[in-house]
């Protein structure tokens, strides 16, 4: 079953998130299991909403691709992570 992952990166701004995204390079090397990704500013930091085929695929991506790039992007706090089961999604 697909899972939704909602992240809040406290204190992170657009410049830091863009640096993290550049290091992760998901646009050119699509993560296995990623269905949908969106991000933008939220109160107190940066928000991310992802849909993944499984929590395990998100965890692997986070460990292998996000983790190594966090410090280089200037991100110093751990994200708040909320998971929810995806009952349905529509895509164009």
Q: What does each of the following model-derived ranges do?
A:
Residues 1-49, 53-65, 74-92:
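Short S/T/G/P-rich N-terminal loop/turn motif that feeds into the first structured element of a domain
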Residues 69-70:
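Mid-chain, well-packed structural core segment of small domains
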């Amino acid at each position: 079953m697909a899972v939704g992952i909602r992240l809040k990166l406290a204190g992170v701004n657009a410049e830091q998130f863009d640096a993290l995204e550049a290091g992760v390079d998901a646009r050119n090397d699509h993560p296995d299991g990623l269905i949908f990704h969106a991000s933008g500013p939220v109160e107190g930091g940066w928000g991310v909403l992802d849909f993944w085929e499984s929590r395990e695929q998100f965890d692997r991506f986070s460990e292998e691709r996000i983790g190594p790039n966090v410090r280089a992007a200037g991100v110093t706090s751990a994200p708040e992570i909320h998971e929810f089961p995806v009952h349905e999604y529509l895509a164009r």
